[in-house]
Amino acid sequence: MLKQVIKTVSSSQAPKKYFFKQFCTSTTEKKGRVGLVTLNRPKSLNALSDGLISEINSAVKLFQEDKDVGSIIITGSEKAFAAGADIKEMEKVTLPDAYNNDLLAQWHDLTKIRKPIIAAVNGYALGGGCELAMMCDIIIAGEKAVFGQPEIKLGTIPGCGGTQRLIRAIGKSKAMELVLTGNNLTAVEAEKAGLVSKVVPVEELLTEATKMAEKIASYSQLTVAMAKEAVNASYELTLQEGIRFERRMFHSTFGTHDQKEGMNAFVEKRTPTWHNK
């Protein structure tokens, strides 16, 4: 469904833009070497319904398979990245329903994507929206962005990694405060706490995210994937285990064409030509 291109725009100044078929609750676009997924449920502030999560997964999987795409951006609207899970879908779910159907399990498919994903966050990133942003590899925030895990106000707790990823991003005390009080972080507070990579003016968010995504996509996709895997391994390994894993990954790069090309280009003072192998 997503593979059908419906419009192509190009110019001598700008990279080609491919507009893919619009889903019910999101749109996808390929801008040069960057895949862009835009959440589009404005009436619900991009509440993350099962359908929207399914569409996000479909889009990023397509971009994962596209050899011309080196990085991916997920964004929402100026008012909301995603204001949370779709409570209307959840309010009547019973314990047997949640357990037997493994409620929210499909959300974690995003973390299986090997290409880097940048969350470009404007407005609300609350509950599931904050968790979605944290599943991405880098978070860039517009200056009016708001982050939080307010599930406690609904009589429940974060269910898609909020209690686990938040503590790794900002430490136990601050994570515990947000989860137990339902308080929010402003964009500046989130950057100071380490949740966000950088804060930019609202109108410059997508431009800055695209600039970063393009820079990442300009490198060897193979090496970038290896670097992402090495950094993510730190979540699961002890320091010494992680250092050994990193060293093995480092050694592995010497078996790639792109390592040879990169070092040869450096010595020869030229721009490398990557072959992603």
UniProtKB/Swiss-Prot annotation:
It is an enzyme of class 4 (lyase). Keywords: Fatty acid metabolism, Lipid metabolism, Lyase, Mitochondrion, Transit peptide. Its main location: mitochondrion. The keyword Electron transport does not apply. The monomer is folded into a right-handed spiral of four turns, followed by two small domains which are involved in trimerization. Straight-chain enoyl-CoA thioesters from C4 up to at least C16 are processed, although with decreasing catalytic rate. PANTHER family: ENOYL-COA HYDRATASE, MITOCHONDRIAL, ENOYL-COA HYDRATASE-RELATED. This is Probable enoyl-CoA hydratase, mitochondrial. It comes from Dictyostelium discoideum. The gene is echs1.
